[in-house]
A protein has these predicted regions:
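PAS-family sensory domain signal
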Residues: 1-46, 104-153, 226-277, 364-380
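Sensory/regulatory domains in signal-transduction proteins
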Residues: 41-226, 267-351
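Short, charged, intrinsically disordered terminal tails
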Residues: 341-382
Length: 383
């Protein structure tokens, strides 16, 4: 970094107690790079700071910002004039620090605007992603659609031109110490401006969390080239749409839908639920889980279950399941869902279809779902 360059913010993820690493430097991903080496290189290119700020002091300041969850603002006297050190924590849903962002430079220089970032937690037991209200600052999100917990299927449904679903599911459903992923996604769902997010994930299996901690950085840029699905994906999806075929990835051992491969089945309420497992009737979940061993051996399996509908009741639904090829964990299956004839109308776009039977407690975020249904795009953004 020369004296004429604008120093970027450095994002250091703190997703596990035992490790810290660099998630990004400015707009560029760093893929869990060694944070002390990165800081030493930055300081070496800023001689005034290198001469006045000891590496140990900088490390202590970063750890203090993480442990105390507070901003750090220091002004350092150097031979080239005063220099500034700024550290900002990135908070998750429990007020824990999921990352710290650091900027160093001349006190007279312009500090770049700090893009939005937020922490999230994947809880394996509930199969939900917990997110704080700060997630509404991410491009592509809105306060009207924000909920404190969401399923992984809902996250996948909001992103386009993404092909690493199996890797993500493997980490989330079989968390092992040391497992990590970093990737970028385009969020295209809803009425908001499309956003570009960089997501860093570390698996956790400890007293605090069984699942994973996430860091989501908003890296949306006006100069970002558009991402388009392949002709093959567009063609296959349109063929399934016209044929009325509905395919999903189902976690058989946990009786939940993880991802829609086609348009979601319109008679099934799968989104904005407090608990993703509520998509299937409680008495049918055990029957679905019992198919795991059979699928692991490579066989197909069929079962009829009661799937939650938008009227608050259940619609009989036939599932034809077969193993997902090449997936390392046994619980992942491809399911074809077919509606068994009944007199319950399917959800119609644009109408107030949400109902809660009298005397029944809500099972999901009905207001946010109604907002989504009223503003959803004419075509699904998922490919």
């Amino acid at each position: 970094m020369t004296s004429g360059a604008v120093n970027p913010w450095i994002t250091i993820e703190t997703l596990t107690p035992e490790a810290m690493s660099v998630a990004s430097v400015g707009d560029a991903p760093r893929g869990f790079a060694d944070w002390q080496r990165v800081l030493q290189r930055v300081m070496a290119r800023t001689p005034a700071l290198y001469d006045s700020l000891k590496t140990r002091s900088l490390i202590d300041a970063i750890r203090a910002a993480r442990d105390e969850a507070e901003d750090v603002d220091l002004t350092l006297a150097t031979g080239s004039g005063p220099h500034a050190l700024r550290i900002r924590p990135v908070f998750g849903p429990g007020g824990d620090v999921h990352a710290v962002r650091l900027w160093m430079g001349s006190a007279a220089a312009t500090c770049p605007e700090l893009p939005a970032a937020v922490g999230a937690i994947w809880d394996l037991n509930t199969q939900t992603i917990q997110q704080p209200i700060g997630a509404t600052r991410l491009t592509g999100n809105s306060a009207e659609q924000h909920v404190p917990v969401m399923s992984i299927a809902e996250l996948f449904h909001r992103i386009s031109a993404f092909n690493r679903h199996a890797e993500v599911l493997d980490l989330l459903y079989s968390p092992k110490a040391g497992d990590k992923l970093q990737f970028e996604v385009t969020v295209t769902d809803g009425p908001e401006r499309p956003g570009r997010w960089r997501i860093s994930i570390r698996a956790r299996d400890d007293a605090r969390t069984q699942g994973a901690w996430l860091l989501i950085e908003d890296v949306t840029s006006d100069n970002e080239p558009s991402e388009w699905p392949t002709l093959e994906r567009v063609g296959l999806r349109e063929a399934h749409r016209r044929a009325g075929t509905h395919l999903a990835i189902v976690q058989t051992e946990r009786a939940s839908i993880s991802h829609w491969l086609t348009d979601p089945a319109p008679w099934i309420r799968w989104d904005y639920l407090f608990r993703p497992v509520d998509v299937f009737h409680p008495d049918d979940r055990v029957r679905l889980m019992a198919l795991s061993d059979r699928l692991q051996s490579g066989d197909t399996a069929g079962v009829t279950v009661r799937a939650l509908n938008y009227g608050g009741g259940y619609t009989p639904t036939s599932l034809l399941l077969y193993p997902y090829p090449g997936y390392p964990s046994r619980q992942l299956a491809i399911a074809q869902l077919v509606r068994v004839a009944d007199d319950m109308p399917m959800l119609e776009s644009g109408r107030n279809a949400l109902e809660t039977p009298q005397g029944q407690a809500p099972i999901g975020y009905d207001d946010q779902l109604q907002y989504r249904l009223a503003h959803r795009l004419k075509r699904s953004p998922v490919y």
